[in-house]
């Protein structure tokens, strides 16, 4: 009788408006209940029945109510759903198709409509992409609904980790096919003929997209002329063409374990633009004068267009063995041997120059997966960069320094790799930390390139692994930008890469700018949109690489008796919930829950900001410590490795 009475409705609205409301993010638990996390210190309990209305990660507003003398959050309004586009496994029940999202906190099926072509033999466990169409917290909806938009792969296919990961981050999994007859070379530019010179390439034995070649001439007074020749794909790719737009979309060649997705069509990257032995190829070259102390003499260095012909395709391991007096391999002729000797000399003097006047980064091992022909992980092995790798790297760094200088002086813009060191707030934290170790710096000093280089040289000279780790936590991230700026991590005034145009679109952009300087032609200034696309792509590639490696590590350890052996691992991070370590043997990241560090919770403190674990106020573990770890569990659904100290 009073159901629709206006006074009663008004009273209900008033009472409802007086109930306190909070906004936060839903956090699920394995037991079914959850919490509404307001900030790092405040959260409210969400009972099991209320969790049925929301999903882990949803941003919502909730009413705060009292239930059995306990304050609880009752979900009221959805602000932003956690699930929008997602990956999951298909569930088939007669004619009904559902999907379970691939996430540790999602275990329930979501009924789906289908807007893509499914194979006739689709089975439960097959992988697909879906979008959330309906949410329970939106008024009028009583269930979650999704729509399948792309079928990925069968559940038992050997490529599941690769294709699922690529689909998750909306990355291509195929090579772009291009008819060779449609590739037209721009032959209008004048090029110097250097095909008679003894250019050599050094790369991995499996590399097909070879984009750099080197040649050295010795000068008087211990100086050298180094010519760095880089493949010129922009001579085949007009600016703004469909192929150019295709390259921009991909932005990078994606190197995943056992699975490479090129930026450019293979007809270009592995054939016409690859600096193959005894094949005449167009290049952009940089002639670099280096004095006996390793200093680049910019007044005698310049860029030009050329034709070259590689006289030898060499392999990193063979060259390293020969220069390190190991193995049986020898250069095929004295000219090639002489080139290697001179390149090694340049490496030594340039490295010494950068040690004294810039910054050398510390050597870190690389971990590589050994895969079988059907993509099973056979082993994970560690490799350190050897002499040949460092020779090529030093030559590329010198060439990129020259590019940054020329672009800055001639145009004032390009695509630069910039790293600003510390921002204002973090510089204060760094100064306080350094003072505890007896190093006196002021915050303004370490924010200058000179001061930052001084700090890095001190840390490189002394063995302060913990201090080094903490300071790196305060460093800013490197970024790409259009205008020149310092690269603190390299200790350089400016740095612009151009030496991998087959693999990086940003290098193609700098190629076009350098060519406009060389040929005195119209400069096409890159748009801001290009940087946004490249940075977004780089971010997704890094996340995909991390996720795939986690998946492959979990597959690798699942295939062996992982509980029998212990191994050395370095503590790389401390969280409130435990610590993360990295195996020194194979590079696997392993999480150790706090309960395995000490079983009395109120005696344990995991101090995330300090990177230290205290037990009864005594320091027991800190980042950079090497500890013995035993693997005890593999959480296959989340691809996480769980361990404990030995």
Curated annotation (Swiss-Prot):
One Pfam family this sequence matches: OB_RNB
Cellular component GO terms, alphabetical: cytosol
Domain S1 motif, chain residue ranges per copy: 564-646
EC number: 3.1.13.1
Class in the EC hierarchy, top level: hydrolase
Domain RNB: 191-519
Disulfide bonds: none
GO biological process, one term: mRNA catabolic process
GO molecular function, one term: RNA binding
Matching SMART domains: CSP, RNB
Catalytic activity field: Exonucleolytic cleavage in the 3'- to 5'-direction to yield nucleoside 5'-phosphates
Similarity-based family: Belongs to the RNR ribonuclease family. RNase II subfamily.
HAMAP family linked: RNase_II
Function: Involved in mRNA degradation. Hydrolyzes single-stranded polyribonucleotides processively in the 3' to 5' direction.
Name recorded for this polypeptide: Exoribonuclease 2
Organism: Buchnera aphidicola subsp. Baizongia pistaciae (strain Bp)
Gene name tied to this protein: rnb
